[in-house]
Structure formats: structure tokens, C-alpha cells
Swiss-Prot record:
Effect of residue 471 to S: Loss of SMAD1-binding and of inhibition of BMP-SMAD1 signaling. No effect on interaction with BMPR1B and TGFBR1
Organism: Homo sapiens (Human)
GO annotation, cellular component aspect: chromatin; ciliary basal body; cilium; cytoplasm; cytosol; Golgi apparatus; heteromeric SMAD protein complex; nuclear body
Effect of residue 231 to P: In AOVD2; uncertain significance
Cross-link (Glycyl lysine isopeptide (Lys-Gly) (interchain with G-Cter in ubiquitin)) at residue(s): 173
Result of changing residue 390 to C: Risk factor for CRS7
Consequence of substituting residue 325 to T: In CRS7; found in a patient with congenital mitral valve prolapse; uncertain significance; no effect on inhibition of BMP signaling pathway
Family to which this protein belongs: Belongs to the dwarfin/SMAD family.
Official protein name in the record: Mothers against decapentaplegic homolog 6
Result after altering residue 36 to N: In CRS7; uncertain significance; no effect on inhibition of BMP signaling pathway
CDD domains xref list: MH1_SMAD_6, MH2_SMAD_6
Lineage: Eukaryota, Metazoa, Chordata, Craniata, Vertebrata
Amino acid sequence: MFRSKRSGLVRRLWRSRVVPDREEGGSGGGGGGDEDGSLGSRAEPAPRAREGGGCGRSEVRPVAPRRPRDAVGQRGAQGAGRRRRAGGPPRPMSEPGAGAGSSLLDVAEPGGPGWLPESDCETVTCCLFSERDAAGAPRDASDPLAGAALEPAGGGRSREARSRLLLLEQELKTVTYSLLKRLKERSLDTLLEAVESRGGVPGGCVLVPRADLRLGGQPAPPQLLLGRLFRWPDLQHAVELKPLCGCHSFAAAADGPTVCCNPYHFSRLCGPESPPPPYSRLSPRDEYKPLDLSDSTLSYTETEATNSLITAPGEFSDASMSPDATKPSHWCSVAYWEHRTRVGRLYAVYDQAVSIFYDLPQGSGFCLGQLNLEQRSESVRRTRSKIGFGILLSKEPDGVWAYNRGEHPIFVNSPTLDAPGGRALVVRKVPPGYSIKVFDFERSGLQHAPEPDAADGPYDPNSVRISFAKGWGPCYSRQFITSCPCWLEILLNNPR
């Protein structure tokens, strides 16, 4: 039987969903670890899209490969076919149909909605409701959407647990298919391209009518359903999502007739962190001390840039972004630093949003990969390779936002993130896929200028500092931002 292209796209999207994979001992606090580079003793995990923050972060992996694959195949193996693996030891003999000479996996039909060639992916379980990870160990009971009981310690899975898993998976598949089948072929193409590129090609908006979808007895708006399916398996509520500034849902009314369901047009909001670190002798103003103009270790370009920023910040702009006389003034300038050396010229930003990246499949902005330096340390080279899709910096009505598009965390400090009246430096960790308001216009207006005796070295109340992959401050071995291999300085020009 011939199948339409639309049904093939729907099946490919279903196979591209992600599976949570718990990491033991993971914590997203600011107290050090290998991922943020505070200790630097072990290498980073393989570059996968680890979405989430806080304790128990999840590593999410695509069920299907990112490359296009022929979706035409035969029907069949609907029950047992949902359990598939990509290599590894055979199923336990306690499972029905797992004999010595044959296996349920051996009769897999390549075109079925739940099937995958053995060499394409290391994920061995299906859907969001899997009880076991790739190594065969029982999953944590707190896994999102996993409503079934875990396997008893003394034997195989009970019939009730298997039955409930299949029901939950079938419900998710039914709700997802009902939503995707409402989309036109062009919208499905856009959605698939965004999912398979992991946001490298976010594409346009995918608009759907606001529907009363329900999953597990709970409301599941389209943006929540697809965000949970393709990016954040632990996502619980739509209020945790923030539409990006270029999305239809950003400007549309909250109760409008349509909503964008492209999961890469949304970011996840950074929630409150653990209590601030204990009092430190370092203050936010001490952070700026290494950039003091009298510091003899600064290069000529650094000193020239700092002096120029104080006297005439409007004189600097990237050559390719030189504005005409009719264009409005830039709202910020971006400086890229490697440790204590500024690399390249200041990049002036005129548009509402700008991408700052090392390697991006499609798009424009500030490409850090094109900035050359004769001598780079090994730590800088490693960190530059982790920038990837980088960040999206946007000026919005309430402030300046930074969205982490990469696969590694970023670390942010700004005057409006510091505790009012506090002297301890506050550095916020932003996991992949999350966004944070790095500069709050309202809070900035309420803050008083620092007292003269408190200002130790140059202090700019309208600047933001962002480090890629490596943290700094009281909770890390790096006390100063200039100890970070790759970081940005965002110099706001007349905030608001």
C-alpha cells in the first residue's frame, strides 16, 4: 500500500522523539563539577543535548537518527515491535517470545513506526515511558511521565507493568499523531527540519489552533506536548516555556486562536537556584579589578578598548555592520575575550536579536569561529569547540534575555542578577535550552549607583558577562572572569 508523504513525515517525527537518560549524581548547582569546568579534572561527556537543570538533570537522545530515512515500509509487529534495541545482549528468557532460536526483535519490519536499524542509534528503549536504560538497569521512579511500576527485584516485569507501559505509550502516540495530522505538509517539513537539526535550523512558526489536548488526564497544549516530546521529557507546565522574540507566540495574545508548536521557537525559563553562596571577600566590583587601566599585563588593544568605551562607545562597530546615517543607534556592543585578551573588534548590534555562535548551520550574527588568534592554549581550543550554536541575545520590553542554544551550559553575571546590597558575586548557570533575563530594565532603574569608596576599579552598571562552559566566582576554582577561556562582555548602550 502506498503511503502519502504527510504520513511519512508524521512517522519520522514520531521516531525523532527523545528518551530521558538519568545521570547519577548529577546536580545543577553552582558548587562545581566537571560540566562547568570548575575543577577541570575530567573530560566533558559526549556532546549530546542535555536538557534541564538542577538536581537530576536528564540527558536526552533521539530515538531515530537525524539523517532523513525512507519511511515507507510494511505494517506489522505493532505489539512486540514497540520494544526495540540497537545491539546489545538478547532479551531475558522470561519475556514471551524470546526463544533460543528466534526473538521478537528478529522479525522486525523496517518500515514500522517503532523500528530502527541496529547501527543507527544506541538508544535501546522506546518512548518516554521506558522502565530501563540502555544498560538494562531499572529507571528512577521519578522519571517524567513514567507512571508504571518498576520491575520487581526478583524477576521479570509483571504483566500489569507491561500493560500499563503500552497503554501510556499508545496514549502518547495517539495524541501526538492527532496533533501532527492537523498540520500541512509544509509545516511538517519545517517541524522535522527543526527537530533533526536540533535547532540549528529553527525554521518558521508552525501554527496550530489552540486545541484541548489531554495526556494522562492532564491538559497538554501543543507547545507543551511537542516540547516534552522532542526536547524536555521532564517538562510539566506550559508556563515553564518562553517563546523566542521572533516567534508568533511572542507577540500574540495569550488566548489567541492559534499558537506556535515549533519546539525550537521556545526556551525553558531558569528557575530559582539554591541559596546564594556564603559571604566571599570578592565583591562584584572586585571582578572588574583585573581590567583596571593601570594593569600592566593588559595588552594595548584591551587598554585602548576600555578607554574608548569610557569616552566614545558609539565609535566602535563591526565593519560589516557599519550603520548608515538613517539607521538607529546600536543597543549593545559585544566583545569576545579569551582569558585576558580581547579577540576581534567590538560587534555592534542593531537588530532586536543577535546570534553569537561558533558554528551554525543556517543564520547570521557574530561568528566566533572566524576570529583568529596566532597562539591559543589547549583549554581555549577545547572550550571554543563547545560553543556550538552559542547563544541568542535579544532586547525585549522587560530587559535583555540570553537563550542558550548550545549543548553546554553558560554562566552569567550582571548587576541586576546580584543580590541587592550584597557583596557576594552571583554567577548564574544556564543549562542548554534554557533562557535567563540577563539585564532587568526595571531593576536597573531602581538600583543606586555604587558609592565612590565602594567602587574598586572600573565598574560599568550596564554590562553583562557570559562565559561559555566554564564557571567562575566563589563556588569555582576560577575567581575572576578573566580566568575563563572564552567569554563575552555585553556592553549595553543606553538601556531602555
